[in-house]
Amino acid sequence: MLLVTACVAALTCTVRSSSSSSNEADKDLPILKIGVTDNDPFVYIDTTGDYAGIDIDIARKACKRAGIKPQFIDISWNDRDRLLKNGDIDCLWCDYSPCYREDDYYWTEPYLTLTVSVAAKKASGIKCLAHLDGSKAIAVIAGSVSERRLLAGDLEISPDVQIKSYGSAELCKAALAKGYVDCWMADVQSLDRLVAQYPSVYRVFADNVMTVDLGVAFDDSYEGEYVKNLNTVLFDMDRDGTIERIVDNYKAGVTTDGQGAES
C-alpha cells in the first residue's frame, strides 16, 4: 500500500529544480512549496528547462523580498486541493482567482487584475460578442471563472451559445485550431500570445468580457505567516511598479519561449 501511494504521488506532484532557487545565499531560507501547472504566459518551461512566466517571476520577486525560498512543484491541477490538504504543496500560484472560491481557500490579497476577452479565427467572420449566437461554440477552461459566468448567464453573451469546457488552455487552443469550437474565452494575455504566434489566423475581440482578480491560494486552515508577509511585499511590488514591469515583459511578441490554470 505504501508503494502504491508513493507511485500515485509521483505522478501528480513533481518537483522541478529552479536555477533561481538554488543559490548558496538562500539555502537556509524557509521554503514555500508552490503548486503550478503549465499555463503560458503565466507558467511554462523555457528553452533552458527552467520555469518562466508572469506568475513565476512575480513569485520569485515576492519570495526574495519576503525572505522565502520558492520551490515550484508541477502538479496535476485536478489534484490541487488534495495536495494542499496533505501538505505536499503550501499554496497555488498559477493564474488562480478567488472569484467564486472566496471561502474555499485562505487567499492573499489580489496581486493582479486580468482582462478577459475572446479570440476567433479571422476566416470565421466572428469579430465581436454580438456575433455569438446559438450556432456558435465557445471554449473555456473547466472550472474557470469564464465557465462559471457563462453557465450562470450573467455575461452579455447570448445564452444560446454552446459552452465547451476543456482541462487546460492548451486543449482550448487545440479545439479552436481544429474547428471543434468557434472561439476561445480567456485572459487577454493568453489570447494575445496566440495571435502573436499566428497573426494571420486569429483575432482578439475589441470588446472585453470582464475583469478577474488573481490571488495566491493557501489551504483554508492555514495559520502561518506566509500570507501576511506576501500581502506586504505584493502590495509594495504593485506600488513600485515591479508587477507592471513583469507583465509588460510577457506582452505579445516579447517572450516566445512558452509551451503554453485559468481565468
How would you describe each model-predicted region?
Residues M1-Q71, T242-S263:
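N-terminal hydrophobic or amphipathic helices and topogenic motifs
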Residues D79-R82, C94-D104, R149-A152, A175-T211:
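A ligand-binding cleft/hinge motif common to bilobed small-molecule-binding domains
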Residues I56, R60, K64, K69-L132, ...:
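Acidic, polar ligand-binding/catalytic clefts
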Residues K33, T37-P41, Y51-K64, A120-E170, ...:
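Bilobed "Venus flytrap"/periplasmic-binding protein-like clamshell domains
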Residues G53-R65, A123-I126, A130-K136, V140-V145, ...:
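Extended ligand-binding regions for polar small-molecule ligands
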Residues P41-D46, R101, R148, E225:
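Short, solvent-exposed loop/turn elements at domain surfaces
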